[in-house]
A protein has these predicted regions:
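Thiol/selenol-based redox catalytic cores and closely related redox-interacting motifs
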Residues: 33-121
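Local sequence-structure signature of Cys/Sec-based thiol-disulfide redox active-site neighborhoods
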Residues: 1-30
Length: 121
C-alpha cells in the first residue's frame, strides 16, 4: 500500500508531490474522495495520534467556531472524517511509514524515504 492524500487546489501539496516519483502510488484528491475511516485508522496506527493528523490551519475551525484546545482524540478523528480540510496534507502513507504535512523535518524525512527506496530497487 502506497497512498498520497492531497488537495488539487493546494500549491504546496502539488510542489511537494512533484519532487518524487509517484508512479506506483495511489493518488487521492481529498475534496473528491475524503479519507475513509479505515484509512484514518491505518494512519493512526503509525502516528498514535489523531491530533498529529489534524490541520489546525483548516478554515473550518473558524467557520465552525471550534476551540481546538478543548478537543479530545475522538473529536479530532470525527472532524477529519467529517470534512476533508481537517486532514493535514499532503499525507504519504505506506504500510509502515507516514509523512504528514509540509513541515521542514517531515519533508527531509520524506526525501530520505524516497532516496532509500531507490537504493534498494
Amino acid at each position: 500500500m502506497k497512498k498520497v492524500f492531497y488537495l488539487k487546489t493546494c500549491s504546496t501539496c502539488k510542489r511537494i508531490m512533484s519532487e518524487f516519483d509517484l508512479t506506483d502510488w495511489e493518488i487521492r484528491e481529498l475534496k473528491s474522495e475524503n479519507v475513509t475511516s479505515e484509512e484514518l485508522k491505518e494512519m493512526y496506527k503509525i502516528t498514535g495520534s489523531y491530533e498529529a493528523l489534524f490541520s489546525k490551519k483548516s478554515t473550518q475551525i473558524k467557520a465552525r467556531e471550534i476551540d481546538v484546545k478543548t478537543l479530545k482524540e475522538e473529536d479530532f478523528r470525527d472532524l477529519i472524517l467529517d470534512h476533508y480540510s481537517f486532514l493535514k496534507r499532503p499525507v504519504f502513507l505506506t504500510e509502515k511509514e507516514i509523512f504528514v504535512g509540509s513541515e521542514k523535518k517531515n519533508l527531509e524525512n520524506l526525501k530520505i524515504f524516497f532516496e532509500n527506496k531507490n537504493d534498494t530497487e
